[in-house]
Amino acid sequence: PMAGDGQVLVNLGLIHRDNEVIPYWDGWLAWMRSQGWRRFAWYVWDQGPGMPGDWQGRFAPSFEFVFHFNRESRKPNKIVPCKHAGQESHRRAYGSSTAMRGKDGEVGGWTHKGQPTQDTRIPDSVIRVMRHKGKIGRDIDHPAVFPVALPEHILLAYSDPGDIVFEPFGGSGTTILAAQKTNRVARAIELAPSYTDVAVKRFQQNHPDIPVTLLATGQTFAEVEAERLETADADE
């Protein structure tokens, strides 16, 4: 079961049909809410420069959404370096603070009244990570590869080293690589066997010293692959 303060973040892009944006996520958002998941936040993934091409009169696409659900909130980790760390740059020339005020008009401890700027801050609601470019490895491919930096950013913000993170759409194994990089424990699912192979091979190519085995039998991936080929040859 998920921890009480577990956070669910889901990336979805735009779809156009008959010259309109299709809000295909509406039914799913309603279903999540009916299951007790709050529509906690809605972020934008800034993918960098717009994609080249003819977009039928629209601006070139350069973003996607990230929907954030939870049952209870958790403060994100401060992972973004502050440009003016250690400086009192939030003070005006005449000495008053530019820190955010509360509803009562007072500047309190949460906004660090009278303190220098911290080393790090919480991430913005716009996630600025360049889209993936190029190949993902030798003799492997996937039609929708995400940059490792995207799940890495989320994992650093909403989990701690040693935490278990769940990826229900394993794809090319991007979240698995991000978990390995950030010292999290990934649990991923992928329904397409061919993409499961891609994810495993991609992980092996990035981490050749880490053994990959089938839990049920202890076989290595190479042994399982060879067994499949033997079965396929026997069926022909």
Predicted segments, located by residue:
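Core catalytic lobe of class I
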Residues: 1-197, 236
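S-adenosyl-L-methionine
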Residues: 200-236
